[in-house]
Regions:
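A short, hydrophobic C-terminal helix/tail in secreted or cell-surface proteins
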Residues: 346-364
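Sec-dependent, cleavable N-terminal signal peptides
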Residues: 1-19, 351, 358-359, 369
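The right-handed parallel beta-helix/beta-solenoid scaffold, focusing on the short coil/turn
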Residues: 25, 41, 47-49, 57, ...
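Extended, solvent-exposed polar beta/coil surface segments
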Residues: 53-54, 61-62, 68, 80
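Flexible "stalk/tail and boundary" regions
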Residues: 21-24, 31-39, 55, 71, ...
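Right-handed parallel beta-helix/beta-spiral solenoid domain characteristic of secreted/periplasmic
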Residues: 62-63, 83-92, 119
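Extracellular/surface-exposed low-complexity segments
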Residues: 9, 14-37, 41, 205, ...
């Protein structure tokens, strides 16, 4: 009986060739190994730990709960390389009642080489919070999410780079980011929505049409969020949802165009109207920003009648000088969209208007004498 009790209360032990957890050194995985199990257990990669999955190596992470992490990475995981295959699979074979911890978590870095793949499959906890959190992820290979059922939870990546050879397909799983930088060179991103939390986020679009398979970018918080978008080629955003107290900054390279098909507020407990919202354009030039036809310019601001919301428009030139003028829309028949246009008074016309005003003021002063 005593031996049975001891067996019941023994902690889960990983039967694998990996060094004991936490990993605090470099380890090359070239065979087929596994961590985790369906009832619990955590494998940790410490800040000084480096796990290399090369030479056809496969690591399978199995879990059956998310009350705590199954894999925690605060170091570096390298999956595959340009000339060497590597695979990391995260799988839950059965459903379970969700907890509140990320299955894979940590502030470390995951690098997926050209012949590398990271796959999440099976049951993924479905709840309105983060079930995967990777601090830094660089993708030259493939990242795929293939859930066995619908998913409401988020795949959070704070700092992301997707190379020309890379692809990030999250399937039906929402993406999430906070206080980081996303550099997208190619391959693109496929997801229902990118949810942006409070703080500041930068998105660099370094190729054409990189977000055409991302259905929406949504600013979740109304406590103050800044999203910076640096656009280096023609790109389309299907839906851009913003909240109150949001600032959206655009820097669009000369000759490039950014199209936003739908520019709307986020549903905030059935309150759609948003206040204190600003769109800021740096190195602004006409012919660079286009949106749909359900918008007006009113009081020199962008007005969205469907949600009775005003967006302050601010523009700067290439030297950082504030551009003052009149905003308007011009219909672009080729794109079937509105082009946002800023008409800035010519210096000569401005000087003449200033001179006329000064003369009128002087004559008015004489008439009073």
């Amino acid at each position: 009986m005593a031996s049975l009790a001891a067996a019941v209360f023994v902690l889960p032990k990983f039967s694998l060739a990996l060094p004991d957890s936490p990993l605090g050194e470099k380890y090359d995985l070239t065979g087929s190994e596994a961590v985790g199990n369906t009832w619990g257990g955590t494998y940790q990669i410490g800040e000084s730990g480096v796990l290399n999955i090369f030479g056809g190596g496969i690591l399978t992470v199995t879990y059956g709960q998310n009350n705590w992490n199954t894999l925690t990475n605060n170091g570096v995981i390298n999956i595959g390389a340009k000339d060497s295959a590597g695979t990391l699979i995260v799988d839950s074979p059965n459903s379970f009642t969700p907890g509140w911890a990320a299955v894979v978590g940590g502030s470390g870095t995951v690098n997926i080489g050209e012949m590398g793949s990271l796959t999440f499959t099976g049951y993924i906890p479905s709840y309105w919070w983060t079930s995967v959190h990777i601090g830094n992820m660089n993708i030259a290979g493939a990242v795929s999410v293939i859930p066995s059922a619908g998913v409401d939870s988020y795949f959070r990546v704070d700092n992301l780079t997707v190379r020309e050879s890379g692809s990030f397909d999250s399937g039906a799983m929402h993406l999430s980011a906070q206080n980081g930088v996303w550099d997208i060179y190619g391959g693109g991103i496929s997801a229902p929505k990118l949810r942006v939390a409070s703080g500041e986020m930068t998105v660099n679009l370094r190729g054409e049409n990189l977000l055409e398979n991302l259905r929406a970018i949504s600013i979740d918080s109304n406590t103050g969020t800044t999203v910076k978008m640096n656009v280096f080629a023609d790109n389309i955003i299907q839906n851009l949802e913003f909240n109150a107290n949001s600032v959206i900054e655009f820097s669009i390279s000369r000759g490039s165009r950014l199209i936003i098909n739908n520019f709307l507020t986020k549903d905030n407990n059935n309150v759609w109207q948003a206040e204190n919202v600003e769109a800021v354009f740096y190195d602004y030039s006409n012919g660079s920003f286009f949106i749909g036809n359900d918008y007006w310019i009113q009081d020199n601001r962008l007005y969205i009648p469907a949600v009775d919301t005003y967006v302050t428009l601010t523009a700067y030139d290439g030297e950082g000088g504030l551009l003052s003028g009149e905003w308007s829309f011009e219909w672009n028949e080729q794109l079937n969209l509105n082009e946002l246009v800023l008409t800035v008074p010519e210096p000569a016309a401005f000087a003449a208007a200033l001179g006329a005003f000064a003369l009128a003021f002087a004559l008015r002063g004489r008439a009073r004498r």
